[in-house]
C-alpha cells in the first residue's frame, strides 16, 4: 500500500494532480480544494490510498491523514465505492463525517451528490460502530498545501471543477467570506466544503 507520496507538481486538473518524483509522474486523484491549491513546480505531499481493480490502479490523495482514513472507512459500507467515497470527502472532512454518522444526521450526508435518504440511513447503520477510528490525530502531510493564490480563487476554481458555473461559484465564495474573516487560519478544504453546503441549499 502507498500510504504517503511526495513530489513536485508537474500538472493539475479539477480533481487530480501529477506529482513528479525522480522523473516518474504519478497521477493522484484528490478533492477539488486540494487540486486547486496545487501549483506547478512546487512540492506537495499527500496521504494516499491505493485502490486496486482488475484493470487499474488508482491513487487517491488527501492533505489530512484522517481524511484518507475516512475515505477508506466509508468504502466498507455496502454500495460505497471509491468514486462515492471521494465525493463524500470533497464535501465533509473526517470529523464532520464522524459527527454526522454518530448523531445519525442523514441530512448532512445527503449533501453529498449521489447519496439519498436511504443511502444515508444505510451508511449510518453500517458505520456507526466504526467511526471511533476517525479520532483526529492532527497529522497533516508536510508541505501539502501551498497557498500561492488568493483563497477565493482557489475555492472558486475547485467549484468550477466540480461542474458549477463561474457565477454560482463566485456567489458561493461570497457566502463563506465571513467564515474566513472570523477564522483567518481556516483551510481551503474547509472553505470549499462550506461553499458546497451553501450551493446544496
Swiss-Prot record:
The keyword DNA damage applies. Residues 1-63 are annotated as: Domain I. InterPro entries: DNA_helicase_Holl-junc_RuvA_I, Hlx-hairpin-Hlx_DNA-bd_motif, NA-bd_OB-fold, RuvA, RuvA_2-like, RuvA_C, RuvA_C_sf. It is found in: Cytoplasm. It comes from the Bacteria. Keywords: Cytoplasm, DNA damage, DNA recombination, DNA repair, DNA-binding. GO terms for molecular function: ATP binding; four-way junction DNA binding; four-way junction helicase activity. HAMAP family: DNA_HJ_migration_RuvA. Residues 153-201 are annotated as: Domain III. One of its GO terms (cellular component) is Holliday junction resolvase complex. Residues 143-153 are annotated as: Flexible linker. The RuvA-RuvB-RuvC complex processes Holliday junction (HJ) DNA during genetic recombination and DNA repair, while the RuvA-RuvB complex plays an important role in the rescue of blocked DNA replication forks via replication fork reversal (RFR). RuvA specifically binds to HJ cruciform DNA, conferring on it an open structure. The RuvB hexamer acts as an ATP-dependent pump, pulling dsDNA into and through the RuvAB complex. HJ branch migration allows RuvC to scan DNA until it finds its consensus sequence, where it cleaves and resolves the cruciform DNA. Belongs to the RuvA family. GO terms for biological process: DNA recombination; DNA repair. Has three domains with a flexible linker between the domains II and III and assumes an 'L' shape. Domain III is highly mobile and contacts RuvB. CDD domains: UBA_RuvA_C. Homotetramer. Forms an RuvA(8)-RuvB(12)-Holliday junction (HJ) complex. HJ DNA is sandwiched between 2 RuvA tetramers; dsDNA enters through RuvA and exits via RuvB. An RuvB hexamer assembles on each DNA strand where it exits the tetramer. Each RuvB hexamer is contacted by two RuvA subunits (via domain III) on 2 adjacent RuvB subunits; this complex drives branch migration. In the full resolvosome a probable DNA-RuvA(4)-RuvB(12)-RuvC(2) complex forms which resolves the HJ. Its main location: cytoplasm. This is Holliday junction branch migration complex subunit RuvA. The keyword Cell membrane does not apply.
Amino acid at each position: 500500500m502507498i500510504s504517503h507520496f511526495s513530489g513536485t507538481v508537474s500538472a493539475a486538473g479539477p480533481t487530480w494532480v501529477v506529482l513528479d518524483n525522480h522523473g516518474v509522474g504519478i497521477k493522484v486523484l484528490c478533492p477539488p480544494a486540494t487540486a486547486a491549491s496545487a501549483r506547478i513546480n512546487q512540492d506537495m505531499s499527500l496521504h494516499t490510498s491505493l485502490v486496486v481493480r482488475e484493470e487499474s490502479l488508482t491513487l487517491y490523495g488527501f492533505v489530512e491523514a484522517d481524511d484518507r482514513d475516512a475515505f477508506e472507512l466509508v468504502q466498507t459500507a455496502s454500495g460505497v465505492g471509491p468514486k462515492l467515497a471521494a465525493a463524500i470527502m470533497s464535501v465533509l472532512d473526517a470529523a464532520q463525517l464522524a459527527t454526522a454518522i454518530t448523531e445519525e444526521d442523514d441530512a448532512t450526508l445527503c449533501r453529498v451528490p449521489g447519496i439519498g435518504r436511504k443511502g444515508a440511513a444505510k451508511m449510518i447503520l453500517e458505520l456507526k460502530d466504526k467511526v471511533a477510528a476517525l479520532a483526529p490525530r492532527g497529522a497533516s502531510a508536510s508541505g501539502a498545501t501551498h497557498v500561492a493564490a488568493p483563497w477565493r480563487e482557489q475555492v472558486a476554481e475547485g467549484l468550477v471543477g466540480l461542474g458549477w458555473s463561474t457565477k454560482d461559484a463566485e456567489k458561493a465564495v461570497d457566502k463563506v467570506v465571513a467564515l474566513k474573516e472570523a477564522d483567518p487560519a481556516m483551510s481551503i478544504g474547509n472553505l470549499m466544503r462550506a461553499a458546497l453546503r451553501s450551493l446544496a441549499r
